[in-house]
Amino acid sequence: MSTPHADTRLAAVDIDPSAASAYDTPLGITNPPIDELLDRASSKYALVIYAAKRARQINDYYNQLGDGILEYVGPLVEPGLQEKPLSIAMREIHGDLLEHTEGE
């Protein structure tokens, strides 16, 4: 009894070069580059803590907006559409917009 074989030929696909630019440059860990971010902290662990603390402040800022309390400082860079607080914090660190003392 013979079984039908699937056609295994591949067809060439033409890629439109203008379609490649349809997507924005990714933000966050890939942009700004991690190597440039590491220049702003003594270690990768210090960078993680630094960025996480700032991301928490940004998140708390957004959460307090509805209450009318302005206890936290909002983003110091223009946030992108649906950009995460950690990505915003990374861009602020990269832009040297924050003052930071390690160990606090």
Curated annotation (Swiss-Prot):
One of its GO terms (molecular function) is DNA-directed RNA polymerase activity. Keywords: DNA-directed RNA polymerase, Nucleotidyltransferase, Transcription, Transferase. Pfam families: RNA_pol_Rpb6 (PF01192). Its EC number is 2.7.7.6. Promotes RNA polymerase assembly. Latches the N- and C-terminal regions of the beta' subunit thereby facilitating its interaction with the beta and alpha subunits. NCBIfam families: rpoZ. This is DNA-directed RNA polymerase subunit omega. The gene is rpoZ.
